[in-house]
Amino acid sequence: MTGLFYRKEINEDKFLKIGLIYDLKTSLESSTFSQLERRIPNSLNVLVIDTIANDISREYIIPKNYGFGISYEILDRLSFGIDLRFQPWKENSGYEGQDNSYKNFLQISSGFEIIPDAEDVNSYFKRVTYRGGLLFKRYPYLINGEETNNIAATFGLSLPVGSISRINLGFEIGKRGS
């Protein structure tokens, strides 16, 4: 995967960040062996009846991948952003010689992070980082001819432990499927 990242300083503690990713299409090669066999009752022996496929090589294409993200940050206070990812699976036919239909993969996610006061030594909860987000994914595969989508809300906390350590907790609630 290849990417570009640009960070623009708006002023001393405010930043605009932009990122792009691109991944070339790749292929997976596999070989298939399939045989028809019969198990002999009350025995560990197997009777091979017929070899259906022996060492058939196949190629499976994983399509290229594009992504774009933009975020705004106020240092040690606030950050929010949005990411988009796209993968053109629709042009992929799956294994060579098989009729597979795919949809294009799409992911849209957005989120925020708030730290009320990172330097307040008198209030633990003002140093906690609070996170939230929304997510939509359209998966490339079909189940029973139907699209499979994922819609979710995410929540998280980053709890300070000592002077430099943190415990991160994340939760996701949503629906996958149609």
Describe every region a protein language model picked out.
Residues 1-178:
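Outer-membrane beta-barrel porins/channels
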